[in-house]
Amino acid sequence: MFELDKDTFETEVLQGTGYVLVDFWSEGCEPCKALMPDIQEMEKTYGEQVRFTKLDTTKARRLAIKEKVLGLPTIAIYKDGQKIDELTKEDATAANVEAMVKKYI
């Protein structure tokens, strides 16, 4: 998974082409850390069609607010720089994330 920061988010996600999944997480978020291995497994299956990335929101608070990330974990899918779907908090389960990814490939 490509580790985003406030400097690379613009080029990798907002100016990117195709589908990009962003895992918004933080070190203090236990559900985020529990979900991460599942997301990494999905990358092995769907990584050809969707670019998998993650952003530690504690290092990019303003960016998270700008992207309307109101709770963690938030898993968002962008297409050609536009956010097209997201799952937040309790909805961000491995099964729901995989279903969301499959919807767009």
From Swiss-Prot:
Ranges where the Thioredoxin domain occurs: 1-105
Disulphide-bonded residues: C29-C32
Gene3D superfamilies for this protein: Glutaredoxin
Transmembrane segments: none
UniProt KW keywords: Disulfide bond, Electron transport, Redox-active center, Transport
Gene Ontology MF: a single term: protein-disulfide reductase activity
Gene Ontology terms: cellular component: cytoplasm
Protein task: Participates in various redox reactions through the reversible oxidation of its active center dithiol to a disulfide and catalyzes dithiol-disulfide exchange reactions.
Family indicated by similarity: Belongs to the thioredoxin family.
Protein name: Thioredoxin
Classification of source organism: Bacteria, Bacillati, Bacillota, Clostridia, Peptostreptococcales
Gene symbol of the encoding locus: trxA
